[in-house]
């Protein structure tokens, strides 16, 4: 087991992960931001170096003091050989199976290993799988072979403009975290609000302010570089505001050179249509999250 800490080693790791896109996307996005100052103070662990098979990105041990906070206790995993990484992932030095935690990966094949480890460590595993998209600009740069007409869903829909007298673009403030948390699918609790506050404070965000001077539609970015937690207040839905937020967010982050990707729930047809309008590229792999609760 090796810890990857220096900027030089992180760059080598990022370059290696790029060769395995899109399956390595979740870890690639995280390592990109680790090498841009590592604002979430994460660490990379590999089974061997430099010719690694499996890499795990996780918080520092001293930052994992709350055994019940799976938003903080998050592990990002990529393995070149997902069927034979169980011993490495089972090590307590790699993953603390005594805590509530979540594992995210662009590899569904890790599911069997995680289920086995869940049984070994006596706990419950809940799996959520979603569609995975890469923003077209990012896909053209990182995975040009996937940017092909046969992979794209062509949409002729055009969103209606919004009233710029009533609605204004802005950046979210930490004080808006409770509002975001109130309608986030994975949120709605005190620990998720702390995570949202940290994302708003650390990374660029976009919102549309409504007539009352509060956000009515928004989108954030998390510590893995994923575009997440987008939402619109029920009162303002069906006005295509989320499209304008997403479009503005992509162009803002594109100027910063960030790789951009996102997941969409398999039943969320509205955001799937929006992704088609925006030209997001659907990936052949999926977004996966496993929530683990020890008994």
Curated annotation (Swiss-Prot):
Compartments where located: Cytoplasm, Cytoskeleton, Microtubule organizing center, Centrosome
Keywords, A to Z, come to: Acetylation, Acyltransferase, Cytoplasm, Cytoskeleton, Microtubule, Transferase
Q: In this chain, where does the modification N6-succinyllysine occur? A: 41, 48, 124, 128, 140, 255
EC no. given is 2.3.1.13
Q: In which tissues is it expressed?
A: Specifically expressed in kidney and liver. Up-regulated in the regenerating liver as well as in hepatocellular carcinoma.
Please give the GO cellular component terms listed in this UniProt entry.
centrosome; microtubule; mitochondrion
- Give the sites modified to N6-acetyllysine: 41, 43, 48, 80, 83, 124, 128, 140, 150, 255
Single GO MF annotation: gamma-tubulin binding
What domain of life? Eukaryota
Chief localisation class: cytoplasm
Reaction equations catalysed: an acyl-CoA + glycine = an N-acylglycine + CoA + H(+)
The protein's matches in Pfam families, at most eight in alphabetical order, are given as: Gly_acyl_tr_C (PF08444), Gly_acyl_tr_N (PF06021)
Q: What does this protein do?
A: Acyltransferase which transfers the acyl group to the N-terminus of glycine. Can conjugate a multitude of substrates to form a variety of N-acylglycines.
Q: How does it assemble?
A: Binds to microtubules.
Q: Which family does it belong to?
A: Belongs to the glycine N-acyltransferase family.
Q: What's the name of the protein? A: Glycine N-acyltransferase-like protein Keg1
**Species the sequence originates in:** Rattus norvegicus (Rat)
Q: What is the lineage of its organism?
A: Eukaryota, Metazoa, Chordata, Craniata, Vertebrata
């Amino acid at each position: 087991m090796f810890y990857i800490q220096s900027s030089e080693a992180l760059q080598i790791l990022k370059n290696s992960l790029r060769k395995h896109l899109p399956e390595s996307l979740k870890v690639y996005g995280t390592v990109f931001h680790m090498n841009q100052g590592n604002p979430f103070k994460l660490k990379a662990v590999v089974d061997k170096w430099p010719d690694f098979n499996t890499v795990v990105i996780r918080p520092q041990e001293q930052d994992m003091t709350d055994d019940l906070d799976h938003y903080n206790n998050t592990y990002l995993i990529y393995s070149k050989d997902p069927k034979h990484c169980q011993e490495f992932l089972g090590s307590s030095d790699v993953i603390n199976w005594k805590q509530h935690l979540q594992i995210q990966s662009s590899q569904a094949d890790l599911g069997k290993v995680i289920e086995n480890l869940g049984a070994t460590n006596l706990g419950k595993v809940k799996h959520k799988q979603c569609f995975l998209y890469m923003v077209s600009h990012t896909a053209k740069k990182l995975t040009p072979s996937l940017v092909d007409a046969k992979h794209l869903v062509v949409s002729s829909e055009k969103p209606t403009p919004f009233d710029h007298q009533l609605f204004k673009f802005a950046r979210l403030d930490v004080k808006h975290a409770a509002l975001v948390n109130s309608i986030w699918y994975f949120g709605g609790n005190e620990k998720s609000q702390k995570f949202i506050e940290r994302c708003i404070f650390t990374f660029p965000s976009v919102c549309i302010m409504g007539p009352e001077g509060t956000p009515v539609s928004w989108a954030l970015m998390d510590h893995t570089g994923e575009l997440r937690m987008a939402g619109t207040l029920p009162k303002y839905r069906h006005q295509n505001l989320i499209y304008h937020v997403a479009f503005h967010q992509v162009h803002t982050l594109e100027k910063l050179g960030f790789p951009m990707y996102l997941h969409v729930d398999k039943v969320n047809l509205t955001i799937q249509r929006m992704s088609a309008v925006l030209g997001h590229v659907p990936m052949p792999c999926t977004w996966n999250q496993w929530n683990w609760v020890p008994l």
